[in-house]
Amino acid sequence: MLFETIRARVAAGILLAVFLTAGNVPAQAASTKNIVLVHGAWVDGSGWKPVYEILVRDGYHVSLVQEPLTSLQDDVAATKRILDLQPGPCILVAHSYGGTVITQAGTDPHVVGLVFIAAHAPDAGETEAANGKRFPSATSKTNAIEKTPDGYTYLDPAAFPKAFAADLPPEQAEFEAHAQVLTAAGVFTAAVTDPAWKVKPSWALVADADEIINPDLERFYAARAHSHVVEVKGASHSVYQSRPKEVAALIEEAAQHAQDR
């Protein structure tokens, strides 16, 4: 009888110790497996292919938004259509003007984190055009941005390789210069109303040789949003194509930690 009593007390003590120990171990947040990629002005989603391939290889479910680039409202709507197709929580990633799109669209409940890749991240009432005047880029100081009679913009193909894609192979940069998606001028003067980065954790990549968006503006956005930020030395505005490993690594970091913030 005495032996049985001692054994019962020992067993109870072990169970209590296990319970107390488990209570002191922080819960591990689930990794987010769904990634949505949003392109910027003058391009389409195909430029994300190198990043897409890395993310898919690493086990992520990746979707791409093809914005019409006709208005901020239309581009946000296109993004939300893809968000509605996600099977669970997702990380919303954008390049360039796409940052304005995800700033507006990222309040969607599917989104648990934002990643800005050489991208804009305006506050409520701000526009890309106004912020670009505060932080002029190398390209904005030239006449490289052209406009059609009906109000669609594009980069002078002769200026595109250096301004947009200086670290891509020359043949690729030349092709992209002639494959631009004309973008409504109004997207650059459309104001954000409800910035997602104020309520969602964010990560940001600064391309320090960017000639489309002033790198100091990218730094300003990241600091204001309290983003986890990395800088890629020598990277052009096309950093998402030229440095896909660094870009994918930042996206995966966001995916692994967004839900524990």
Model-inferred region functions:
Residues 11-22:
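Bacterial N-terminal signal peptides
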Residues 30-87:
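Active-site catalytic motif of lipid deacylating hydrolases and related acyltransferases
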Residues 40-43, 96-97, 120:
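Active-site glycine-rich loops that stabilize anionic/oxyanionic intermediates
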Residues 93-98, 102:
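Gly/Ala-rich beta-loop-alpha elbow adjacent to hydrolase catalytic centers
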Residues 110-157, 184-187:
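Flexible "cap/lid" loop of the alpha/beta hydrolase fold
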Residues 178-198:
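Active-site nucleophile elbow and catalytic-triad environment of alpha/beta-hydrolase enzymes
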Residues 204-206:
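Short beta-strand/loop motif that positions the catalytic acidic residue
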Residues 208-235, 241, 253:
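Conserved loop-alpha-helix segment in the C-terminal half of the alpha/beta-hydrolase fold
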